[in-house]
Curated annotation (Swiss-Prot):
InterPro entries: FAM90, Znf-CCHC_6. It comes from the Eukaryota. Residues 182-197 have a biased composition (Low complexity). The gene is FAM90A22. Belongs to the FAM90 family. This is Protein FAM90A22. Residues 74-89, 97-114 have a biased composition (Basic and acidic residues). Residues 1-43, 70-389, 415-437 are annotated as: Disordered.
Length: 464
């Protein structure tokens, strides 16, 4: 049996077993490669050495214990300054060093001159020289000493103002003072004129041939005085008092002054509440047969519109004597209206604490205006139905000369409407007008002769 075994086959089995053992040991730990495995043609990508690859265990990048610092291939004397040049001794300076020294000394000599000029212009005191003989410290001295603070130069003198700026400020202050002084006389004169008038004189205004629209300022300041020119009014009356269907929109009476030939229209501030008397309203007259302008100029309004309020007046039905109602605002001339000829419209009315100044508008007729005695207001019949209270009423009559006349029919405040006699007794101008001959005219004629924009009434009603 033993003779039958081949020794070669036994040797092969032994070699195989040894190789298997070696492979098992290599998996457990690194093994040193035999010398025949090194190939000088191979190069490692990790360390850059020849003789092994990146997968080889001989690579020093994998076994740090055997890692060696790679040596340089050659010295780079051209790139590295291995032997720096030593500075030359000051005893034998070269020609270049002499030129540099002269250039440095020149600016140092010019520094005191510059500082002296700066002190003269800026007014700062000259700096005292340091004890070590140096005139100024270098900018990097405070960085060398860690504990030393940064030097700060302070002066006890205040900076001087530029003379040009001082002159400008003085001229501006003087200019403001002159403007205030020029404005103050106007205010004083207007205040004196308003204070000189009595409570009754303030309620009456002066009328001229053609008064220009007065400019009203907000606040308690007096109004500007505008003197009119004696010329024929173009486009009808220059001012017509516009009022709403409330008692706060009533205007005071404006009576012409006979002794003043050319008085100035001076709207004054609001007087005490005296508009609830029965002498309310002014009368205006317009002549028929005139052309209507394209657009009526509107005067500036003082306050913003406010909500309307109900009036305390109630008008008796028995007090109406002929005429037609329905015009938003109508005016009545005085008895001597036809004799005086064309004149001016009434002055802008004053307001009471419960009233608001109304917007004055020109009528859409180019007719001459007659002098008026008192302002008169009435409300829309539609507004009366909307408010629920009985509004003021105006009686319209056509005169013999073809002009219209209007009279206010209103009951006294807080009185019963069943007493028309008291109202007629307190308002004599209404009784005088009732005696004049009158003709009943349909409302359409009144609307054509007296057209007033409804927008003005809405704005006046919202003023409250």
């Amino acid at each position: 049996m033993m003779a039958r075994r081949d020794p070669k086959s036994w040797a092969k089995r032994l070699v195989r077993a040894q190789t298997l053992q070696k492979q098992r040991r290599a998996r457990v730990g690194p093994r040193a490669p035999p010398p025949d495995e090194e190939d000088p043609r191979l190069k490692c990508k990790n360390c850059g050495a020849f003789g092994h690859t990146a997968r080889s265990t001989r690579c020093p990048m994998k076994c740090w214990k055997a890692a060696l610092v790679p040596a340089t291939l050659g010295k780079k004397e051209g790139k590295e300054n291995l032997k720096p040049w030593k500075p030359r001794a000051e005893a034998n300076p070269g020609p270049l060093n002499k030129d540099k020294g002269e250039k440095e000394e020149r600016p140092r000599q010019q520094d005191p001159q510059r500082k002296a000029l700066l002190h003269m212009f800026s007014g700062k005191p000259p700096e005292k020289p340091l004890p070590n003989g140096k005139g100024s410290t270098e900018s990097s001295d405070y960085l060398r000493v860690a504990s030393g603070p940064m030097p700060v130069h302070t002066t006890s003198k205040r900076p001087r103002l530029d003379p040009v700026l001082a002159d400008r400020s003085a001229t501006e202050m003087s200019g403001r003072g002159s403007v205030l002084a020029s404005l103050s006389p106007l205010r004083k004169t207007s205040l004196s004129s308003s204070s000189s008038l009595g409570p009754k004189e303030r309620q009456t205004g002066a009328a001229a041939d053609m008064p220009q629209p007065a400019v009203r300022h907000q606040g308690p300041e007096p109004l500007l005085e505008v003197k009119p020119t004696h010329s024929r009014p173009e486009g009808g009356c220059q001012e017509v008092p516009q009022a709403a269907s409330k008692t706060h929109g009533l205007l005071q009476a404006s009576r012409p002054q006979a002794q003043d030939k050319r008085p100035a229209v001076t709207p004054q501030p609001c007087p005490p509440a005296a508009t609830h008397s029965l002498g309310l309203g002014s009368n205006l007259s317009f002549g028929p047969g005139a052309k209507k302008p394209a657009q009526a100029p509107i005067q500036a309004c003082l306050n913003f519109p406010k909500k309307p309020r109900l009036g305390p007046f109630q008008i008796p039905e028995s007090a109406i004597q002929g005429g037609e109602l329905g015009a938003p605002e109508n005016l009545q001339p005085p008895p001597a209206a036809t004799e005086l000829g064309p004149s001016t419209s009434p002055q802008m009315g004053r307001r009471t604490p419960a009233q608001v100044p109304s917007v004055d508008r020109q009528p859409p007729h180019s007719r001459p205006c007659l002098p008026t005695a008192q302002a008169c207001t009435m409300s829309h019949h539609s507004a009366a139905g909307h408010d629920g209270a009985q509004p003021l009423r105006v009686l319209f009559r056509r005169l013999e000369n073809g002009r219209w006349s209007s009279s206010l029919l209103a009951a006294p405040s807080f009185h019963s409407p069943e007493k028309p006699g008291a109202f007629l007794a307190q308002s004599p101008h209404v009784s005088e007008k009732s005696e004049a001959p009158c003709v009943r005219v349909p409302p359409s004629v009144l609307y054509e002769d007296l057209q007033v924009s409804s927008s003005s009434e809405d704005s006046d009603s919202d003023l409250e």
